[in-house]
Amino acid sequence: MVSQTAAAAAPADPIVDVEMESAEDAEAAKKDAELLAVQEIRDHARQIDKAVVSKEPRFILRVLRSLPTTRRKLALVVVRSLAVQLYPAGPERDGIMAYIEDYPAGAQEPELPRPRAAIKSPVPEVDAYFHLLLLVRLLDKNDLPKATKCSQDLMAKVVGQNRRSLDLIAAKSYFYHSRVAELNNDLESIRSFLHSRLRTATLRNDFEGQAVLINCLLRNYLHYSLYDQADKLVNKSVFPETASNNECARFLYYLGRIKAAKLEYSVAHKQLVQALRKAPQQAAVGFRQTVQKLVIVVELLLGDIPERKVFRQAALRRSLGPYFQLTQAVRMGNLQRFGEVLVNFGEQFRQDHTFTLIIRLRHNVIKTAIRSIGLAYSRISPQDIARKLGLDSPEDAEFIVAKAIRDGVIEATLDPEKGYMRSKESTDIYSTREPQLAFHQRISFCLDLHNQSVKAMRYPPKSYGKELESAEERREREQQDLELAKEMAEEDDDGF
C-alpha cells in the first residue's frame, strides 16, 4: 500500500517544479524588460544631450517619434530608477518624486541593478522630456489631479526657458497640456495661454510649435462650437508647410469641420479627403473613423452617394453602421426612414458632431426623391408626388418641385392649369462640362502631390557648391592636361 501511494504521488512533483520555474521565468523576463526600458530612456536622454551640443533637432525628433512605444514601458520601478539616475538628491528630485507613487504596502521592491545616482542636474531639454513622460504616465493612469499639477509645472519649465533646442519637446508638451484641460472640461481657461504661446512660436519661427498650438486652439474653439472664431483664426494665421504629417492631418480635419459648418461643402470635402490621406493608414483608427464619418455626411450634402466599399472596411464597419443606414435613406429618398435613423442614432450623431449637418440632409432626401420620380415618370400630378413623399398637401409638393426645377435638380416643367409635372428627356452627361471638371480635379491633385513631394525632399546645403571649380578654372585645368599629354606623347616618340 505504501509503495502504491508513493508511486501515485511521484508524477506530481515535476508539475510543481515546472509551475515554479515558469513563474520564475516570467519574473525574470519582467525584470529584463524593466531594465531594458530604463536603458532605452537613458539612451533617449543621451540623444537629447547630443542634439543640444550639435544643435541638430533631428535627434530630439527621433526620440519624440518613439513616445507611443515608450509610454507603454513606464512602469513604477522604471520611472523611480530614472528619477534617481537623472536628478541629484535635493528639492529638484523631491519635486519629481511627488508625481511618482510609492511601492504598494507590503510589496517587495524589485531588485534592479543599483542605479548610479546623478551628480548634477540634467539639461533643461532632458528635464522637460522626463517631466513629459511623467505627465503621459499620469494620463494613462487617469490620475487627473496629479496630471493637472504636473502639466502646470511642465508649462512653467517650458515658458521659463528661451532655448531653440527645447522647441520640439515644448510642442509636444502643449498638446498634452491641452489634453489635460479637455479632460477636466476646462479648455476655456487655457485659451489665452495658448494664444500667447502661439505669438511667441511665430516670432521664433518655431514651426512645429505653431502647428500644434494652432490645432489646440482650433480644437478649443470647436469644442464650444465657436465656428466664427475658429474661422478667423484660420484666416489670420499661417499653418506651417513643414509641420509633421500628423499635425497637418489634424489641421485639415478641423478646417473641414469649419468649412462644412459654413456651407462650403466642396472645400470641406477636399480638406477632409486630404486629412484621410495624410493620416497613418494602419494606426490612428479612431482619427480615421472620425474623419470618415464627416466625409460621408459632406458627400451626402454634395448630392453624392459614398461607395459601399467605404462601409466594408474592417476597422470602420462597426462605427459606420448608423451612417450606412443614413446613406441608404438618402439614396432612396425615403423621408420616413430618414426620420427613423435620426430617432435611433441621434445621440451618437451628436457625439460625433455631425447632427447639425445631418439635419440639413432632409432637403437632400427630398431632392433625391424628386429626382427619382422625375426619372421614373414622364408626367405626374402634385397629389401623387405628395403621397410618395409623405407631404401634407399637394401645394407643398408643388412648391418643392418648383424649387427643385429652379435649383437645377431636375429638368421638368410645371403645368398649373392641367395639374401635372412633365419631365424633359435626360441629356447625355458627356456633352456637358462634368467630365472636364472631374479630370481637372484629378490633375490638380496630382500636381499638388508632386509639389509637396519636391518640397519634402532634403537637398545639400548651398555651401556645397563653393568647393566646385569655376568654368575658367576648369578650362585651365583641361589645357594643362592636354599639354601634359602632348609632352608624354613626345617622350614616348623619343623613346622609340
UniProtKB/Swiss-Prot annotation:
GO terms for cellular component: proteasome regulatory particle, lid subcomplex. Acts as a regulatory subunit of the 26 proteasome which is involved in the ATP-dependent degradation of ubiquitinated proteins. Keywords: Proteasome. GO terms for molecular function: enzyme regulator activity. InterPro entries: 26S_Psome_reg_C, CSN3, PCI_dom, WH_DNA-bd_sf. The 26S proteasome is composed of a core protease, known as the 20S proteasome, capped at one or both ends by the 19S regulatory complex (RC). The RC is composed of at least 18 different subunits in two subcomplexes, the base and the lid, which form the portions proximal and distal to the 20S proteolytic core, respectively. Residues 464-480 have a biased composition (Basic and acidic residues). Belongs to the proteasome subunit S3 family. Residues 249-428 form the PCI domain. Residues 458-480 are annotated as: Disordered. It comes from the Eukaryota. This is Probable 26S proteasome non-ATPase regulatory subunit 3. It comes from Anopheles gambiae (African malaria mosquito). GO terms for biological process: regulation of protein catabolic process; ubiquitin-dependent protein catabolic process. Pfam families: PCI, Rpn3_C. Gene3D superfamilies: 1.25.40.570. The gene is Dox-A2. SMART domains: PAM, PINT.
